[in-house]
């Protein structure tokens, strides 16, 4: 990975599982077990130390994901890793399908209405379960359902622009 390459935060270590060095993970991928598909991982401890890991294996275990890191075989080592963040290089993710987007790619894009009224820039997104919502910050904060083509008319990465059919007063 190039030092300047964009990193994507996929999850974090939330605890130890058992006594053999297995770890409990929190994953923000969809589905959550997809975190194991994207490697190598760049792990960053709460103190800022970073290392690169390949060959991480894992499984679903009830409410948790359980991971096995190469060369970690004891609980004490795992407990010291609590809060460690898990990243991958953006290039490790496969291209999205047509009309699907990685949230991280949308963050920072400018948003304007079909009438050309500038609303601001994408701050972040969140899921409601039924659809995703894009949070746009400009003169004020707006939450717009990320629903194609009903509200989101186009996403143009070259123009750094999302066009929406949205009342600017709402």
From Swiss-Prot:
Keywords on record: Chaperone, Cytoplasm, Ribosome biogenesis, rRNA processing
Localisation per UniProt entry: Cytoplasm
A GO term from the CC aspect: cytoplasm
Family of the protein in this entry: Belongs to the RimM family.
Gene (UniProt): rimM
Protein task: An accessory protein needed during the final step in the assembly of 30S ribosomal subunit, possibly for assembly of the head region. Essential for efficient processing of 16S rRNA. May be needed both before and after RbfA during the maturation of 16S rRNA. It has affinity for free ribosomal 30S subunits but not for 70S ribosomes.
Pfam families, per the entry: PRC_RimM, RimM
Major localization listed first in the record, in broad terms: cytoplasm
GO terms for biological process, alphabetical: ribosomal small subunit biogenesis; rRNA processing
Name assigned to this protein: Ribosome maturation factor RimM
Organism of provenance: Xanthomonas campestris pv. campestris (strain B100)
Position of the signal peptide: none
The record's note on its domains: The PRC barrel domain binds ribosomal protein uS19.
Record note on quaternary structure: Binds ribosomal protein uS19.
SUPFAM superfamilies hit by this protein: PRC-barrel domain, Translation proteins
Record-level Gene Ontology MF annotations: ribosome binding
């Amino acid at each position: 990975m190039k030092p300047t390459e964009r990193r994507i935060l996929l999850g974090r270590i939330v605890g130890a599982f058992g006594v053999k060095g297995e770890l409990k993970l929190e994953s923000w991928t969809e589905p959550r077990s997809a975190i194991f598909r994207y490697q190598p991982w760049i792990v960053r401890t709460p103190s800022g130390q970073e290392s690169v890991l390949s060959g991480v294996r894992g499984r679903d275990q009830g409410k948790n994901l359980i991971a096995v890191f190469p060369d970690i075989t004891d609980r004490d080592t795992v407990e010291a890793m609590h809060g460690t963040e898990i990243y991958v290089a953006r290039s490790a993710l496969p291209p999205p399908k047509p009309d699907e987007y990685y949230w991280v790619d949308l963050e920072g894009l400018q948003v304007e209405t079909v009438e050309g009224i500038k609303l601001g820039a994408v701050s972040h997104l969140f899921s409601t379960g039924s659809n995703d919502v894009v949070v746009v910050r400009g003169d004020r904060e707006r939450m717009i359902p990320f629903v194609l083509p009903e509200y989101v008319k186009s996403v143009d990465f070259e123009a750094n622009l999302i066009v929406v059919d949205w009342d600017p007063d709402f």
